Amino acid sequence: MLRALSRLGAGTPCRPRAPLVLPARGRKTRHDPLAKSKIERVNMPPAVDPAEFFVLMERYQHYRQTVRALRMEFVSEVQRKVHEARAGVLAERKALKDAAEHRELMAWNQAENRRLHELRIARLRQEEREQEQRQALEQARKAEEVQAWAQRKEREVLQLQEEVKNFITRENLEARVEAALDSRKNYNWAITREGLVVRPQRRDS
């Protein structure tokens, strides 16, 4: 209590002096000191329900959109009536100006369409030439692969023909047998891990 009174006494000289007028009965002026019971009072705002606040905000937004749409509709209607009221020379001049601007825009649009059409034709021709070049390169590569495959098969055939000469057939079977019997090569030997040749020893009968 003493702290409140001292604070009230310290704050009084800093405030402007109250005007010398009779206040209304039952109501204080802005310059009157606060009551003792309200000096340390803290005004707390009332609690707000989040769901109710969300609903109110949605309704307020809908209200603003509706009012804005009505306002725009009213403004457009007023402008249309003013424009209809000014029918005459100004409206005719504006119509002529709009027609001339429309013709200029149509001419520019046609020129732009022709330019884009030419660019498209040039691009398609370029793509066609590139496609032909790719096809020619692909055909050349396939031809080279076919030629390489044919040469490889030809070499295999020649090698097989050379190997066929050493094959044993019915015609040269007897000659090959005689040649093998007349050969002095001895295949009856072995090699040790140390690289020595071991031949079978003949047993005396």
Curated annotation (Swiss-Prot):
A Pfam family it matches: MRP-S26
Domain of life: Eukaryota
Subcellular location: Mitochondrion
Transit peptide limits: 1-27
Any single GO CC term annotated in Swiss-Prot or TrEMBL for this entry: mitochondrion
GO molecular function: RNA binding
Similarity comment text for this entry: Belongs to the mitochondrion-specific ribosomal protein mS26 family.
TM region(s), chain numbering: none
Gene expressing this chain: MRPS26
InterPro entries: Ribosomal_mS26
Keyword Glycoprotein included in the entry's annotation: no
Keywords associated with the record: Mitochondrion, Ribonucleoprotein, Ribosomal protein, Transit peptide
This protein's name: Small ribosomal subunit protein mS26
GO BP, sorted A to Z: mitochondrial translation
Subunit relationships: Component of the mitochondrial small ribosomal subunit (mt-SSU). Mature mammalian 55S mitochondrial ribosomes consist of a small (28S) and a large (39S) subunit. The 28S small subunit contains a 12S ribosomal RNA (12S mt-rRNA) and 30 different proteins. The 39S large subunit contains a 16S rRNA (16S mt-rRNA), a copy of mitochondrial valine transfer RNA (mt-tRNA(Val)), which plays an integral structural role, and 52 different proteins.
Origin species: Homo sapiens
